[in-house]
């Protein structure tokens, strides 16, 4: 819909506010031919990006950050309306986006190769862009996750075609307006950045298949990630996918702190966070105390209007998603789960639920992506690690213990992309390597690491010198 510097404005897809359920926008849905055209335009502009000096790439990113910074409140409010995220959490997303843009700008000037000693002459390497980056993003962090792809892509001199989720596309449209403005100010052809809104099954699918795309940078569900991986064939692909992130609580830890951390992180964005707590594995000696604190903390949470500054939990992205969570709770209970609090649904809102489960329960096996905190009692750390590793996922794990030697041993044993000690799994800094193993993904994000993924190493050897 923003292709080659022109906006294509149609009313193809209705976008809803997940809290009021009102239709807030109608957006363009590109068909396959239009998507192919958007990719072709991006491809035609790749040399322009490649030839932009590091200073210019730096300047684009810093200027985008400057404009975003002057509209922080507007962007935070837009995220809350688009996604249903509580406003205090949306503000954090905007701040993190600014960090991601500035870090990307830094790396635009920091791209460097190396020299290799050789008796045959001089060997050195250069970092080069890949060409066209096809960025596909999910609904839950529509600004920050888009920037985690756009920022490093620009820093490394790639042109970009972005497909934001049609469930929450508005923020990406406003971000594109800023990028358009900055490119115009700097007299850079707008076709270096194109926004392809529409349905993922058409637009995202075409991006993953199209031969003019050099790399697909995808964040979203395992199911779509697998389809992208098949379609992409020889293209470079990074996949940031879902998980059932375990949090292990051992008896020697600060139990109150662990309970507070579990509740605070589990119910962020109504549980719609890829590194949300999947299940808490608690040593049996402390499970009663832990559960008591968890219930106390859960009762304090305020459910409701995302625009209210006191709200802790807003709606899920749609009534259908909330219904899915309601049904999951029913299934968990039918399998022996004990619902301790919450789980009541009203349209897209679900009150925060805490459930005691065992290892065979559905909630121990899947990514819920909703406000359910399952607690599972374990005999000891060995059993906790076995349950944690008996999973098809491997994104992040949390571990509470006051024994550093044990913590290091368990960190080695856990088959996860990131281990958070004395924290829930829900921790991410924009400059740390981030990504999963097993079905949770392929490759790493985190600006420096995405810069690596989005650039190619060229080796030059000078003989006879
Ligand atoms: P999703 O349904 O997989 O959608 C993600 C993106 O893929 C959207 O832009 C979607 O477009 C597009 N898409 C849909 N079908 C496609 C296809 N066949 N080919 C190519 N693209 C396609 O995920 P979501 O519901 O938006 O987000 C939730 C998931 O994302 C969860 O599993 C969560 O764990 C994961 N996630 C992971 C991370 C991470 O960094 N590891 C971060 C955030 C979220 P449409 O929406 O228009 O269909």
Swiss-Prot record:
Question: What is the protein's name according to its record?
Answer: Lactaldehyde dehydrogenase
Top-level EC class as recorded in UniProt: oxidoreductase
Q: Which residues form a coiled coil?
A: none
Family affiliation: Belongs to the aldehyde dehydrogenase family.
Q: What does this protein do?
A: Involved in F420 biosynthesis through the oxidation of lactaldehyde to lactate.
Q: List UniProt keywords, sorted A-Z.
A: NAD, Oxidoreductase
User: Sorted alphabetically, which PROSITE patterns does this protein's record hold?
Assistant: ALDEHYDE_DEHYDR_GLU
> Per the record, a Pfam family?
Aldedh
